[in-house]
């Protein structure tokens, strides 16, 4: 099937005199997770991971993805004729180098400029120009092959009340216009759906697990417009737009509107697609959108709400842990059935809307695939042995959650116990960090990796990511990683109100996977002659499975942290449990 699709794509390439065609994982808005309409890379390659770029040449094809997906991609690409390129590994070429190496002068590279951000497109152009290669950015060739392509979504919107958001649309627009004045630009083009959702206190369900509407916006010093189908707007949102003089235009009208912009226009090249920038008559000012940082700095209302969302989520996951530990080996269960059980328990919580991403429910060796997704063809039964890794989260009106626990269901090996403890040590060390204001996540990442690096072991992904507020579960700019990646903006200072995940792990192919994840918020600590100190407070409250620990490997300080954390878990979660569940939780949170 994949070979047939690639063959049809090559026929279209020949018709358009294209020798290389790039299929990124993206949509018109540079969204991390895309709706079915934009699942072009998945359709053409069969690889279902959330990140990857497919390059099809006339005689071969290759797919690039990161360390989260090496094992999964190798399995899913087998027999497809598509070579796996493990990004960042020795000897693996960059995408542009691969293209240049395999094409000859005056050949043409094609892609759909609507699904390529400007920064990436200009980087390709720079390399291709040097190699005397042409670039055609107006080709949606996958659309010509994908005959039963789904429709663009157009779900009803809902107004996100200030009771949850903590700031009015009027205030946000005022802040944005003040930024434009300060930077001496006349307008800004916004295409990131999460930024637009934040700015207009607007939510919808266009993308599974990501409560946003596909839309564009242009804001100037005098006016504002949003580009989406007006028929899908709820009454409160329409009133909000009217009160703030926001004009509603058709979704596809953005290209006429951007072409008509005069004066200086601010464009974030990392998010605005290349087709829009190519369409501008005005000279763009390339600069990061200020909304990226503004929405990462949660206000008091957002923090109050998200703390309550995490209590509710903690209740659901703790109830699940009780059920799982009690019933493993006694009743029939599988990866897919326990995943459904967890979703059911979440759905019983007030103001639950949906999961915040597709749950990773991975038993034994499946957990070595960091982002494994259980499907009927891979689903396995769960018994009272080994470990079960579940990475999951919920979208509540009060906020977004993300948690991973590795559950011990029976006997485990000494190797598994050793690495379970080492990974938890890393989690504790980062959780307990005190640091001077001015640090970024890159300064602190070693705390989480240290216990693993001491043994020459690593995990091939970041330690943590920012988390949105009833928005995307992966939110920039804050995060934890050890390596500076120029295309990512993670050098930002960790500031008060930023929420970041903390999720070190160990992954042994063919054997097991372990991950321990909480969300944490940055708070101010003491200020003295050395400066302003900061630290983290946990938002996630679910016990770590003490059945996996080798306590002898923990320092006294680490044991104290874990005991204090578990005491908090019991105090915050037990009031919402049955007497049997609370009694079990007391044991699960026992002092070590």
Where are these regions (language model features)?
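Active-site neighborhoods and metal-handling regions in enzymes and metal-associated proteins
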Residues: 1-592
């Amino acid at each position: 099937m994949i070979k047939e699709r690639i063959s049809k794509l090559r026929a279209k390439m020949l018709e358009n005199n294209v020798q290389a065609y790039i299929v990124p994982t993206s949509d018109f808005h540079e969204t991390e997770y895309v709706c079915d309409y934009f699942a072009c890379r998945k359709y053409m390659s069969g690889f279902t991971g959330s990140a990857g770029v497919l390059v099809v040449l006339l005689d071969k094809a290759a797919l690039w993805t990161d360390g989260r997906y090496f094992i999964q991609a190798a399995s899913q690409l087998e027999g497809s004729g598509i070579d796996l390129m493990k990004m960042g590994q020795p000897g693996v070429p960059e995408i542009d180098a691969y293209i240049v190496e395999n094409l000859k002068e005056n050949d043409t590279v094609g892609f759909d400029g609507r699904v390529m951000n400007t920064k990436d497109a200009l980087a390709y152009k720079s390399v291709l120009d040097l190699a005397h290669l042409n670039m055609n950015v107006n080709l949606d060739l996958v659309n010509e092959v994908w005959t039963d392509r789904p429709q663009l979504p157009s779900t009803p919107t809902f107004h996100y009340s200030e009771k949850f958001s903590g700031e009015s649309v009027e205030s946000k627009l005022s802040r944005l216009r003040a930024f434009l004045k300060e930077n001496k630009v006349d307008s800004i083009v916004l295409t990131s759906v999460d930024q637009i959702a934040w700015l207009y206190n607007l939510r919808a369900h266009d993308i599974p697990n990501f409560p946003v509407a596909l839309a564009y916006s242009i804001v100037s010093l005098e006016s504002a417009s949003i580009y989406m189908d007006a028929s899908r707007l709820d009454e409160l949102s329409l009133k909000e737009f009217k009160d703030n003089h926001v004009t509603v235009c058709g979704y596809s009208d953005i290209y006429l509107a951007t072409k008509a912009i005069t004066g200086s226009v601010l464009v974030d090249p990392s998010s605005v697609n290349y087709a829009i920038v190519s369409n501008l008559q005005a000279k763009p000012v390339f600069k990061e959108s200020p909304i990226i940082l503004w929405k990462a700095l949660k206000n008091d209302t957002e923090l109050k709400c998200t703390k309550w969302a995490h209590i509710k989520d903690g209740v659901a996951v703790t109830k699940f842990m009780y059920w799982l530990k009690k019933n493993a080996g006694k009743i029939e269960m599988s990866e897919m059935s326990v995943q459904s059980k967890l979703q059911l328990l979440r759905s019983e919580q007030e103001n639950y809307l949906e999961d915040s991403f597709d749950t990773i429910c991975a038993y034994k060796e499946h957990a070595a695939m960091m982002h494994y997704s259980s499907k009927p063809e891979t689903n396995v039964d769960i018994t009272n042995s080994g470990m079960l890794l579940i990475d999951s989260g919920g979208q509540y009106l009060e906020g977004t959650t993300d948690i991973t626990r590795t559950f011990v269901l029976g006997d485990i090996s000494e190797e598994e116990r050793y690495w379970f403890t080492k990974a938890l040590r890393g989690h504790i060390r980062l959780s307990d960090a005190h640091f001077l204001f001015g640090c970024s996540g890159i300064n602190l990442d070693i705390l989480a990796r240290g216990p693993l690096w001491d043994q020459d072991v690593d995990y091939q992904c970041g330690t943590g990511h920012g988390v949105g507020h009833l928005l995307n579960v992966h939110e920039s700019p804050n995060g934890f990683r050890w390596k500076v990646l120029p295309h990512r903006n993670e050098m930002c200072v960790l500031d008060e109100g930023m929420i970041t995940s903390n999720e070190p792990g160990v992954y042994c192919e063919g054997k097991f996977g372990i991950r321990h994840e909480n969300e944490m918020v940055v708070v101010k600590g003491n200020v003295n002659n050395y400066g302003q100190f900061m630290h983290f407070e946990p938002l996630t409250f679910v016990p770590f499975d003490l059945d996996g620990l080798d306590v002898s490997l923990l320092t006294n300080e680490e044991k104290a942290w874990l005991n204090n954390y578990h005491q908090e878990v019991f105090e915050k979660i037990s009031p919402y449990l049955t007497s049997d569940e609370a009694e079990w939780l007391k044991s699960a949170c026992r002092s070590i």
